[in-house]
Design a protein with these regions (language model features):
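Juxtamembrane intracellular "pre-TM" segments in multi-pass secondary transporters
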Residues: 1-12, 192-229, 411
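Helix-loop boundary and gating motifs at the non-cytosolic
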Residues: 10-60, 226-229, 233, 237-255
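Residue-level signature of mid-helix packing/kink "hotspots" within the transmembrane helices
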Residues: 60-68, 152-153, 270-278, 362-363
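Helix-to-loop junctions at the C-terminal end of transmembrane segments
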Residues: 66-78, 163, 276-288, 373-374
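C-terminal ends and interior cores of transmembrane alpha-helices
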Residues: 88-101, 299-311
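Cytoplasmic helix-loop-helix junction between adjacent transmembrane helices
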Residues: 111-148, 336-337
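C-terminal membrane-cytosol helix-exit motif in multi-pass small-molecule transporters
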Residues: 177-201, 392-401
Length: 411
């Protein structure tokens, strides 16, 4: 085997396999985006929006916590073992949903799915960063998120189509095949990338030994104003995504939109998000991170308000396009902003902290929007989330700074 080298061209075969693998990771969660809220309402007879969105709370909390642990562990034992365990945890998910006699089975399935997404998606992100080195991070992250979220969109549409013609549980048979293929790719063809970190580390400033997780958690969460801005934006970004995952299908169904069309609207948002990240990731390398993040949050807020204020299919499609555009501006750019400030030897742990806060947003968004929807209505919940998204973008515009010339100190 040839010695490791940094660069996209030098590692193109493995990089391409990781892009493909992340499409399978995204496909697993895309199966749920259209049908699970409708399943709770129509087959399990749930009337509480908070109860229906409980599966997103289970997913978000699990994913947030395991992001933190998986990233730190990957610095110690390697990326590939974490990736494989993530896919092993995905195997029971479709079976639990297909056979579920009670809603708590769905919650349990989403605990496992959250663990799968935390381990498998985190590792594909970290492994791509390891391979390409410091100069192409935006491109690497854009391609990674493109593959994952375009697959989310594709599977959202496919699951809606299948559900409209065959039943709400039938799409999850696809999940069995996705999980098996993802596991086989991880075991057979994906290689460990920790050796590439050793190549990059000498070019970064040297300091004391890598800090403990507690110190990294503080620095990433609040100790640096730019990293704080990124973490709060990540949380609010997934807060509005959690709301759209749980409430949009119910909101559209309340306006008598057929399941197949609900699937189309739900597919547009992640598909646009995924497709445009191919451009926005590299653009952040040229234009900087702050403007794309701040304006991206503002565009998202506009799309959410359009969805709730203009109840028509065309407006909902346009709202989904705007949400997808805004999220594409934000998602890979936030990851790159975190990486700008972290030393290579603890970069994975810092990304894990950011992803903890970001994915906790799923749980916060689902719980908050569900409680508001139960108290004063679906429309009010959507309005509140749009306002929070706008406020988050303004915070980024006010306090985020450009990347430091060197990774921040931890002491």
């Amino acid at each position: 085997m040839s010695p490791p080298r940094l660069g996209l061209r030098e590692n193109l075969p493995q990089f391409s396999l990781l892009v493909l693998l992340n499409a399978f990771v995204g496909g697993m969660v895309g199966l749920e985006r259209t049908v699970l809220p409708l399943l709770g309402e129509q087959e399990f007879g749930l009337t509480s929006k908070t109860a229906i969105t409980s599966f997103i709370v289970s997913f978000g909390i699990t994913k947030a916590i395991i992001n933190l642990v998986a990233a730190r562990l990957s610095d110690r034992i390697g990326r590939k073992p974490i990736l494989i365990v993530g896919w092993l945890l995905a195997l029971p998910v479709p079976f639990l949903i297909i056979m579920a006699p009670a809603w708590w089975w769905i919650d349990l399935a989403n605990v496992l799915l959250g663990a799968n997404q935390a381990m498998a998606w985190s590792m594909t992100v970290i492994m791509k960063i390891d391979l390409v080195g410091p100069r192409r991070r935006g491109l690497a992250l854009g391609l990674n998120e493109f593959a994952g979220y375009f697959a989310v969109g594709a599977m959202s549409w496919i699951s809606g189509y299948i559900a409209a013609h065959s039943g709400l549980r039938q799409p999850f048979y696809l999940g069995i095949g996705i999980a098996i293929i993802g596991l086989l790719l991880s075991v057979v063809v994906i290689r460990e990338t920790r050796g590439h970190v050793a190549l990059e580390a000498p070019s970064a400033p040297h300091g004391p030994r890598p800090p403990g997780l507690g110190r990294i958690f503080w620095v990433t969460s609040a100790g640096n104003v730019s990293l704080f801005a990124a973490c709060q934006a990540g949380l609010v970004n997934n807060l509005n995504d959690g709301m759209s995952w749980g409430l949009y299908p119910l909101f559209f169904a309340a306006h008598a939109l057929p399941i197949e069309r609900i699937g189309t609207v739900k597919a547009v948002y992640p598909a646009v998000w995924g497709l445009l990240q191919v451009a926005t990731g590299p653009l952040s390398d040229r234009w900087g991170r702050k403007g794309l993040i701040a304006w991206g949050m503002i565009v998202q807020a506009g799309g959410i308000w359009l969805t709730v204020l203009v109840p028509s299919y065309a407006a909902w499609i346009l709202g989904a396009v705007l949400q997808g555009l805004g999220t594409a501006m934000v998602y890979p750019t936030l990851l790159a902003a975190i990486v700008d400030h972290a030393h290579p030897t603890w970069r994975a742990s810092s990304l894990g902290v950011y992803r903890f806060w970001r994915d906790l947003g799923y749980a916060v968004g689902a719980l908050l929007s569900g409680l508001i929807a139960d108290a004063i209505g679906l429309g009010a919940a959507i309005h509140v989330v749009a306002a929070l998204t706008l406020a988050s973008g303004l915070v980024v515009g006010a306090i985020m700074r450009g990347p430091a010339p060197a990774p921040i100190a931890t002491r």
